[in-house]
Curated annotation (Swiss-Prot):
Keywords: Flavoprotein, FMN, NAD, Oxidoreductase, Translocase. Its EC number is 7.1.1.2. This is NADH dehydrogenase. Optimum pH is 5.0. It comes from Thermus thermophilus (strain ATCC 27634 / DSM 579 / HB8). Its cofactor is FMN. Homodimer. It catalyses: a ubiquinone + NADH + 5 H(+)(in) = a ubiquinol + NAD(+) + 4 H(+)(out). The keyword Translocase applies. FMN binds at R17, R18, S19, I20, R21, Q73, L158, G159, R195. Thermostable. Can oxidize either NADH or NADPH with a preference for NADH. Can catalyze electron transfer from NADH to various electron acceptors which include, in addition to molecular oxygen, cytochrome c, 2,6 dichlorphenolindophenol, methylene blue, ferricyanide or P-nitroblue tetrazolium. Gene3D superfamilies: NADH Oxidase.
Length: 205
């Protein structure tokens, strides 16, 4: 499949992006979604654990159920696609051979596995979920920028009942759910963004 070129460069996408809650009815091609997701999955993570997982929801009935779990937010049902970003650290830890670099072999590989396992053994379940969520927000940032660059509008959502989302999608009880992302071709411009100036938030030492 021929790659789709992004519409915008990274800086332009970052400056232009707004949250979009109204979408055209046009479906988002699966090939385009795959291309965006593959690029987003290049996001970095500590130890390269990549604890994030994504459910791509296009089924109308499932979106309707997710809307109810998201306290009635209409764009959850009306968007052509909803991404459910969840974090499953337990799955990542159970498959360390998938994430440790293939160039690391022998004793170094075993030592790295043991170091990772020791680091998380002392953590309780909630701390592990919080850690995995924090890593997943890095992916979320990549994803939002890429969607904008490829001409798609999106809005990240943290307002939902995670237990209901887990039940709807059959996710494991230990999984954290950092965000939902509604997306599609924009049917509105969205509100102009308002951000603090660099001088307010950046310290130079």
């Amino acid at each position: 499949m021929e790659a789709t070129l992004p519409v915008l460069d990274a800086k332009t996408a970052a400056l232009k992006r707004r949250s979009i809650r109204r979408y055209r009815k046009d479906p988002v091609p699966e090939g385009l979604l795959r291309e965006i997701l593959e690029a987003a999955l290049r996001a970095p993570s500590a130890w390269n654990l990549q604890p994030w997982r994504i459910v791509v929801v296009r089924d109308p009935a499932t979106k309707r159920a997710l809307r109810e779990a998201a306290f009635g937010q209409a764009h959850v049902e009306e968007a052509p696609v909803v991404l459910v970003l969840y974090a499953d650290l337990e799955d990542a830890l159970a498959h360390l051979d998938e994430v440790i670099h293939p160039g690391v072999q022998g004793e170094r590989r075993e030592a790295q596995k043991q170091a990772i396992q020791r680091a998380f053994a002392a953590m309780g379940q909630e701390a592990r979920k919080a850690w995995a969520s924090g890593q997943s927000y890095i992916l979320l940032g990549y994803l939002l920028l890429l969607l904008e660059a490829y001409g798609l509008g999106s809005v990240p959502m943290l307002g939902f009942d995670p237990e209901r989302v887990r039940a709807i999608l059959g996710l494991p009880s230990h999984a954290a759910i950092p965000a939902l992302v509604a997306l599609g071709y924009p049917a509105e411009e969205g509100y102009p963004s308002h951000r603090l100036p660099l001088e307010r938030v950046v310290l130079w030492r």
